[in-house]
Amino acid sequence: MEKKDLNVVCAVIHDGDRFLCTQRLRKGPDYIAEHWELPGGKVKEGENDYEALRRELHEEMDWNIYVGAKLGSIEHEYPDFIVRLTAYDCMAHDKDFKLLEHIDACWLRPEEFTKLNWTEADAALIKQLWK
């Protein structure tokens, strides 16, 4: 059976030297449920990355953001799908977001990222962005 390809975008949002990290809900496969990620989501057919990222953060966090430059991209193969994860430099006018689709959120410095249990794709992307 051929694996499904997913195009996913994520936001790198900083407040000074700290970056926003979000924890996934307790749903989906064990290898991603409750793991940490950079906020974002899937790109729908007919959307560009910028539209998808703004839509996802509005739907999942009731938060309006500005999507800036592309920072990097990785491809990762999970047991039942392949994800292409692309990060964008984003800005928010405030920190007034809601956790509508996440368990938790925190602001960490890159050297603190190892404290969290990241999805494999996000861990690979973080390694690339903060090498």
Give short role names for the model-derived ranges.
Residues 89, 98-129:
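NUDIX/MutT-family hydrolases
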Residues 15, 64-66, 74-96, 106:
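Active-site-adjacent beta-strand/loop module that shapes the phosphate/pyrophosphate-binding cleft
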Residues 3, 11-12, 27-29, 75, ...:
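Short secondary-structure boundary/capping segments
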Residues 1-20, 42:
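Conserved N-terminal beta-strand and adjoining loop/helix that marks the start
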Residues 2-5, 32-35, 79-84, 99:
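A generic structural micro-feature
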Residues 18-59:
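Conserved Nudix-box catalytic region and its N-terminal flanking loop in Nudix hydrolases
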